[in-house]
């Protein structure tokens, strides 16, 4: 009798994706983040579902309902903080996953890569709308500032913003629709993840050397299932340490004040994982220019397959490119720091220089350095 694992129409798909999948023998811990992102998504959907059972999307009661979850619901505080800090973990894994793709040239699988970039956009949109739901001061003003950016679009901008708001300001209609979208988007993300994996399994995984590894494959189970379990345990340890010891470490104290349209907080800033993009947005004095720079700062990832001029796929054997890559990482840390600072000297100029450097490294320096390394191969 043939194994049901290999014959059953449904189990067969799971088998080819997670059990008998041929995987390169040399993929490092940097390849763990895909499974960790899957875990993060599962945690977010489950905790989010239980939060939605007690949350009310009405401006009068939203803030109180979140307080009620934390005080009166059994382990409500745990669910709420796991969801809030789970988002931070999600983005840490996302950034590391994208960084791995850039370093090892995984973007040459361009269908997989482009769906990944779309996933990044959708996750960012979901996180933004989720931040609005507790209806604290930063929720309200963050929503006002970010949605207002769309008014920079010529001709239709103002109409578009009022259409998204459902009125003439961020109000009850906005909160209700944001809740609806925040609920549905994670399921759309899950569907996109399946497409992401579908395209990945067409080509097979990349590996640190960037060389074709067809001649040296090992089964995913047990080798990488056990390796993934280690990553999962470490992620849960990090998440629960954050949730149980300092749940508000990454949050904004202003969000413990109920939303008040008549009082603007001194410093409006998004969650930490959006600060790098926020810094790029603020570094351009023109509104439309800022919005375009903001969108392009993420969209630029789609250009990487076109900007890859090196004869080698991975950066493993390219010291100059490695150097530029880590300067880019340092630049992103700088942008994140600047995004959380007030708009004054010297932060304005540092932000502008860091923004220019970000685009220059990606569009100009990395391709140029790749060409130099190609020449050095013959030297």
From Swiss-Prot:
Q: What CDD domains does this protein's entry cite?
A: cytochrome_b_C, Cytochrome_b_N
Residues that coordinate or bind a ubiquinone: 201
A GO cellular-component term linked to this record: mitochondrial inner membrane
Compartments in which it is found? Mitochondrion inner membrane
Q: Report the cofactor remark.
A: Binds 2 heme b groups non-covalently.
Q: Which GO terms describe its biological process?
A: mitochondrial electron transport, ubiquinol to cytochrome c
User: Where does it primarily localize?
Assistant: mitochondrion
Locate the residues binding heme b b562: 83, 182
A GO term, aspect molecular function? ubiquinol-cytochrome-c reductase activity
Positions annotated to bind heme b b566: 97, 196
List the membrane topology term(s).
Multi-pass membrane protein
- Name the keywords, alphabetized: Electron transport, Heme, Iron, Membrane, Metal-binding, Mitochondrion, Mitochondrion inner membrane, Respiratory chain, Transmembrane, Transmembrane helix, Transport, Ubiquinone
Q: What else is known?
A: Heme 1 (or BL or b562) is low-potential and absorbs at about 562 nm, and heme 2 (or BH or b566) is high-potential and absorbs at about 566 nm.
Q: What does this protein do?
A: Component of the ubiquinol-cytochrome c reductase complex (complex III or cytochrome b-c1 complex) that is part of the mitochondrial respiratory chain. The b-c1 complex mediates electron transfer from ubiquinol to cytochrome c. Contributes to the generation of a proton gradient across the mitochondrial membrane that is then used for ATP synthesis.
This protein's assembly is summarised as: The cytochrome bc1 complex contains 11 subunits: 3 respiratory subunits (MT-CYB, CYC1 and UQCRFS1), 2 core proteins (UQCRC1 and UQCRC2) and 6 low-molecular weight proteins (UQCRH/QCR6, UQCRB/QCR7, UQCRQ/QCR8, UQCR10/QCR9, UQCR11/QCR10 and a cleavage product of UQCRFS1). This cytochrome bc1 complex then forms a dimer.
- Return the PANTHER family for the record: CYTOCHROME B (PTHR19271:SF16)
Identify this protein by name: Cytochrome b
Originating organism = Urocitellus richardsonii (Richardson's ground squirrel)
